A protein has these predicted regions:
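Membrane-interface helix-boundary motifs at transmembrane edges
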Residues: 26-42, 97-105, 178-187
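Alpha-helical transmembrane segments
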Residues: 13-21, 91-95, 164-179
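Membrane-interfacial interhelical loops
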Residues: 1, 54-78, 113-159, 219
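Secretory targeting signals
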Residues: 42-104
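Long, hydrophobic alpha-helical segments
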Residues: 1-23
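Internal/C-terminal transmembrane anchor helices
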Residues: 180-210
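Juxtacatalytic substrate-recognition/specificity segment
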Residues: 217-332
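Central hydrophobic cores of alpha-helical transmembrane segments
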Residues: 104-118, 189-196
Length: 333
């Protein structure tokens, strides 16, 4: 949580400072547009990393007094979350200051809001409780789990962040070169740098679901690929984890609890409800983002439940979904 907070602070407090410094750095002479961009980017990034040093020193001192801390893992998270965020914001600021000049501050403000909103939009619209973000790295989930962050997935995501940094630096250099005569070899070099970022970015984005950066409904359907349809439900499950003889019980239990909850709430509920049944805790944690919790998402009329938790949790989650009739419109919580 501390690393995520520092990543957000560097973006919001460091961004305007970076913008002011970027305007001054641009006036310095450079032998080529690309070298000038790399020099300016590293100056901004170095400042961002320096801003992160004092809080890191305080945390190191605190961890030395707490026995259950993992200092190496904490250092890795700090480098990957706010550290990489500083490199990303430095590239963003450099590009905006070159492309928009006087309006760069307003564009940066809007972009930071969009980057801040992205995880919330993703969590609200996709079947996941976590999100990865180029500014603050990752948000590990809206659940009661006390799980270690997936460092491997975060490392791969930060490779995607670096790819975007490379592309932004190449575009910035290209924009600067428009203001001065440039050789064909220089233009080819910039194109090569851009492709150096584009190719890995395209590969990583193509595999985003499989790598764990996100969990789209399309991807979830490939894992829970069998569907049992009843009068009021679309029940998705992994057929390898559900004996054929249990399907009738699962369908009947869903419909029985639906009728019972509807009568108890004295409502008419017309939406079809989607029930995602996970074969085990590991699969639920990897795809949805929680191991210990069963979750209802009333605004989407869906439930995420472990196959072994149907009898214990189905009614509880169904109440959340159907009681949305009494909640605020569009959210229902």
């Amino acid at each position: 949580e501390f690393a995520v907070l520092m990543g957000m602070l560097v973006a919001w407090t460091g961004g305007p400072v970076f913008l002011s410094l970027a305007r001054r750095l641009r006036r310095l002479p450079a032998t080529s547009a690309l070298r000038g961009v790399l020099r300016d980017w590293w100056a901004l990034a170095r400042l961002g990393l320096l801003l992160l040093f004092p809080p890191a020193a305080v945390m190191v001192a605190a961890m030395s007094l707490i026995r259950n801390c993992a200092p190496l893992e904490g250092a890795a998270l700090y480098l990957l979350i706010p550290g990489m965020g500083a490199l990303f914001i430095a590239a963003v600021v450099l590009l905006l200051s070159t492309a928009f000049r006087r309006r760069a501050g307003w564009v940066l403000f809007v972009l930071l809001f969009a980057l801040l909103a992205q995880p919330f939009v993703e969590i609200l619209t996709q079947p996941q409780l976590y999100a990865y973000n180029h500014v603050f790295g990752m948000f590990v989930g809206l659940s009661w789990d006390q799980l270690q962050p997936p460092l491997g997935t975060l490392l791969l995501f930060r490779c995607l962040t670096l790819s975007f940094v490379v592309m932004m630096l190449a575009v910035t250099a290209a924009l600067r070169s428009l203001a001065r005569p440039s050789r064909a070899s220089s233009r080819l070099a910039l194109a090569a740098v851009f492709l150096l970022g584009l190719l890995p970015a395209a590969l990583l984005l193509r595999q985003a679901d499989a790598l764990g950066f996100r969990n789209s409904e399309t991807h979830l359907r490939t894992v829970l690929h069998a569907t049992l349809r009843t009068e009021h439900f679309d029940i998705h499950y992994d057929p390898a984890s559900v004996p054929a003889g249990d399907l009738a019980f699962i369908a009947d239990e869903h419909e029985f609890q639906f009728s019972d909850v509807r009568a108890a709430l004295n409502i008419r509920y017309d939406r079809r409800i989607t029930s995602w049944l996970y074969p085990d805790d590991e699969t639920k944690g990897r795809l949805f983002g929680t191991v210990t919790s069963e979750v209802a998402r009333p605004w989407l009329a869906e439930m995420h439940i472990g196959i072994d938790a149907i009898e214990a949790s189905l009614r509880h989650e169904l109440v959340h979904v159907m009681a949305a009739e009494f909640g605020p419109r569009y959210i229902g919580v």
